[in-house]
Amino acid sequence: MEKKCRRCAWVNPEDPIYIKYHDEEWGVPLHDDHALYELFLLETFQAGLSWATILHKRENFRRAYEGFHPERVAAFDAAKIDALMQDAGIVRNRRKIETSITNSRVFLDIVHEYGSFDAYIWGFTEGKSIRESWELRITSPLSDRITKDLKRRGMKFVGSTSIYSTLQAIGVLAAHAEDCDWRQP
């Protein structure tokens, strides 16, 4: 008999994409700038929607956003915005699309300043994952501080809640539930 896995309560046990995301990505310390960029960009589109919606559109976003290369996205023009607005496979919100371009430029500025986005984002915790007690919270002093800095740099559609969620996803905040099989000791 196969042992049933215990996952964080937010995982829909009927959704294989969500399960795969939880089991293979969420909370795993992420240091690859390309993957970090993808998550930050997707988080822009998540505002007001469920993360499951974004995960189900992820491959469409990868195609529409040319493999999530920040240099390419930063150069998107009005014609590309219009084309994205016609793409039923992604979230078609003009403000979010325009924001994704602005945020890509800010992302590249941060990479230029710090050498990598990884150095920037993990620098807030001196490269260490912070153990979070598993409770229902949506922000933290750390997410507040990072949000304030990103906004100062010109990023849009970033709030402490979305940054908190991203910090959990990339492993800066280690937040698997106490009874989750993926929680690290």
State where each predicted segment sits.
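HhH-family (HhH-GPD) DNA N-glycosylase catalytic core used in base-excision repair
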Residues: 1-185
